[in-house]
């Protein structure tokens, strides 16, 4: 494993110049990004920067060297910096035009009162980029990434926003990177023994949790089963969890899913994990799509119970050894983005459930051994791959990538705002792929 801590270095590709960005005063445009400005302010303490622009008043906080980000393209902002309310500097910045990759990648909005800013990881015509858009659909931040693999495991295959509002990704199934809003690379690790896939997340403990896959033999058949790498803040793998250690009797049935066809030819994918979410308790929830099952696992390496499966939520006969929960209502199938919110409720994007695709909320009672659906946010049309559901200040944000759509639901379950995502006019699998849209703040 290798850890790189490269604060001034900005990663990227297909990002030629800064689109004509300009500035006055102590802030200067980044050479290779149209929407970011690096400031070196005349103070040695923390500052508040106020910007006046087309969307009104914005504020940014940081040390004397900070980056202004989250700005619309082709726009001028007057800025002023203050320490404890006393002005120390002022100037203006004018953002440039977006790079060529946005000639194909575009966003359209219907409705009003959308989320302030959301981040989307996209592969558009082979270009990996994380883009942040505001409630009007305007791009306000972007970060391209270099990728080379062309099979389903390649490109930008895992994504999450950390509690520190940084961007965490894994690329080409082989490396993990964390990028600050300034564009600086904070974390870069490669050299994994097994291929990464689908999802990764940063826990409150500062550790990074990443899904991987391994090849196993079950009764003479090559079988693909999932695991989790646990990395410490230095990028070292400090623990590994393997699903194979927690399986009962399993029927090896070829689902026809070809995600791993080029990596593990001839093998049968049994579990197909697609979500990992560490919780403050030291456990994590994991979605196993091909088992229509979500499980809770102790993944804190400092816990004597590390590796133990707690509850198991899925159909009768699910082969994972753990405490099976009883459905009081609801059920899901082919699910994605299983995670636990602060109130302890489980949220899942249900791709092919009985009531069609929907973001769903479940109350989990481990004492009673039950799961009860308490909310559902259905989307129109098919969602046969990926998908997510997030709780945002503006409402419940549900992503259905197949048609390239993100919907915002209000407290009454009505869609009040939608974002359409297209790549050269196309959506869904093919020219455009993206897994989720996640709230982010600047």
Please report, for each region that a protein language model flagged, where it lies by residue.
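Histidine-/acidic-rich catalytic cores in large beta-rich domains
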Residues: 41, 76, 83-442
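Sequence contexts marking disulfide-bonded cysteines in secreted/extracellular proteins
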Residues: 12-14, 26-28, 38-40, 125, ...
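Residue-level recognition of well-ordered beta-strand positions that form the cores
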Residues: 38-40, 50, 82
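Extracellular low-complexity, O-glycosylation-prone stalks/linkers
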Residues: 46-58
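Ser/Thr-rich, Pro/Gly/Ala-heavy low-complexity intrinsically disordered linkers and tails
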Residues: 1-24
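Short S/T/G- and acidic-enriched coil/turn segments that sit immediately N-terminal to beta-strands
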Residues: 63-67
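Short, flexible loop/turn segments at beta-strand junctions in immunoglobulin-like
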Residues: 68-73
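Pro/Thr/Ser/Gly-rich low-complexity, intrinsically disordered linker/stalk tracts
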Residues: 21-43, 94-100
């Amino acid at each position: 494993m290798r850890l790189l801590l490269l604060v001034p270095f900005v990663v990227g590709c297909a990002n030629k110049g800064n689109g004509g960005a300009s500035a006055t005063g102590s802030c200067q445009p980044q050479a290779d990004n149209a929407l970011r400005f690096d400031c070196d302010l005349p103070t040695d303490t923390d500052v508040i920067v106020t910007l006046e622009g087309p969307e009104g008043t914005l504020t940014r906080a940081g040390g004397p060297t900070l980056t202004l980000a989250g700005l619309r393209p082709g726009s001028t902002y007057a800025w002023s910096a203050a320490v404890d309310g006393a002005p120390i500097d002022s100037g203006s910045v004018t953002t440039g035009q977006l790079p060529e990759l946005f000639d194909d990648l575009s966003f359209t909005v219907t409705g009003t009162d959308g989320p302030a800013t959301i981040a989307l990881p996209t592969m558009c015509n082979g270009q990996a980029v994380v883009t942040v858009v505001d409630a009007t659909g305007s791009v306000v931040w972007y970060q391209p990434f270099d990728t080379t693999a062309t099979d389903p495991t390649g490109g930008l295959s895992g994504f999450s926003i950390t509690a520190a509002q940084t961007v965490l990704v894994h690329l080409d199934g082989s490396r993990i990177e964390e990028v600050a809003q300034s564009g600086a690379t904070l974390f870069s690790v490669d050299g994994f023994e097994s291929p990464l896939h689908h999802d990764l997340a940063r826990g409150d403990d500062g550790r990074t949790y990443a899904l991987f896959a391994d090849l196993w033999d079950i009764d003479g058949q090559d079988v693909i089963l999932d695991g989790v790498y646990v990395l410490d803040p230095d990028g070292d793998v400090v623990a590994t969890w393997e699903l194979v250690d927690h399986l009962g009797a399993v029927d090896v049935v070829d689902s026809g899913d070809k995600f791993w066809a080029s990596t593990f030819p001839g093998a049968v994918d049994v579990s197909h994990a697609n979500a990992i979410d560490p919780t403050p308790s030291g456990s994590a929830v994991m979605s196993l799509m091909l088992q229509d099952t979500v499980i809770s696992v102790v993944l804190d390496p400092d816990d004597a119970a590390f590796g133990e499966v707690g509850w198991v939520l899925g159909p009768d006969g699910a082969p994972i050894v753990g405490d099976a929960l009883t459905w009081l209502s609801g059920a899901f199938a082919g699910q994605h983005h299983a995670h636990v919110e602060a109130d302890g409720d489980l949220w899942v994007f249900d791709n092919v459930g009985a009531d069609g695709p929907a973001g769903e909320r479940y109350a989990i009672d481990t004492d009673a051994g039950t799961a009860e659906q308490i909310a559902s946010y259905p989307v129109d049309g098919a969602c046969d791959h990926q998908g997510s559901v997030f709780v945002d200040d503006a409402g419940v944000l549900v992503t259905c990538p197949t048609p390239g759509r993100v919907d915002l639901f209000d407290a009454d379950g009505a869609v009040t705002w939608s974002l359409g995502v297209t790549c050269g006019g196309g959506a869904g699998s093919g020219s455009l792929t993206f897994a989720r849209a996640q709230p982010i703040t600047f």
